[in-house]
């Protein structure tokens, strides 16, 4: 990380670090349980202390019960005591880098905060780095409760 980079004040866009995280998410993707859609997704969540939590999508015959890779990884992070989440990476075999669904965007914002880096990637090597607040502008959050 280079916190002195004016284009990356949080030091979250280091290409080598992103390559490593994308590789971890890609590895997690191979464990996807997707017998209905055959659409495998992998994810990794990084905590500020450097721990990594992987996830893959887990489908169900009752489609609404399907778990997205991002939510699996976030759930693992929280269940293992991680509270200061830094980055979320998601990858799939798509033409463009894969964005999280609306439910995942809401959970990423809630658990990782508005400035968390979110990396959208595909198997072709394309990627987009954004933030959770950019993915979910005008979000409903605890301040409305």
Regions found by a protein language model. Name each.
Residues 56-72:
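Compact, glycine-rich, soluble single-domain proteins
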Residues 72, 76-80, 106-107:
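Feature captures the catalytic cores and cofactor-binding loops of soluble hydro-lyases/lyases
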Residues 6-12:
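Intrinsically disordered, low-complexity tandem-repeat regions enriched in Proline and Serine
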Residues 2-3, 14-31, 82-145:
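C-terminal binding/interaction regions
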Residues 31-37:
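Extended beta-strand/beta-hairpin segments
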Residues 38-47:
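Short beta-strand scaffold segments in enzyme catalytic cores
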């Amino acid at each position: 990380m280079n916190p002195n980079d004016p284009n990356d004040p949080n030091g979250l866009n280091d290409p080598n670090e992103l390559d490593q995280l994308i590789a971890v998410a890609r590895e997690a993707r191979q464990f996807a349980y997707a017998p209905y859609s055959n659409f495998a997704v992998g994810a990794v969540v990084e905590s500020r202390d450097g721990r990594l939590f992987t996830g893959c999508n887990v489908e169900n015959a009752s489609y609404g019960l399907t778990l997205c890779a991002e939510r699996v990884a976030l759930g693992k992070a929280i269940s293992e005591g991680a509270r200061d989440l830094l980055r979320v990476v998601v990858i799939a075999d798509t033409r463009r880098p894969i964005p999280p669904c609306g439910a995942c965007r809401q959970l990423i914002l809630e658990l990782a905060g508005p400035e968390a880096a979110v990396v959208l990637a595909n198997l072709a090597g394309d990627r987009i780095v954004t933030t959770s607040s950019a993915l979910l502008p005008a979000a409903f959050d605890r301040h409305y409760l």
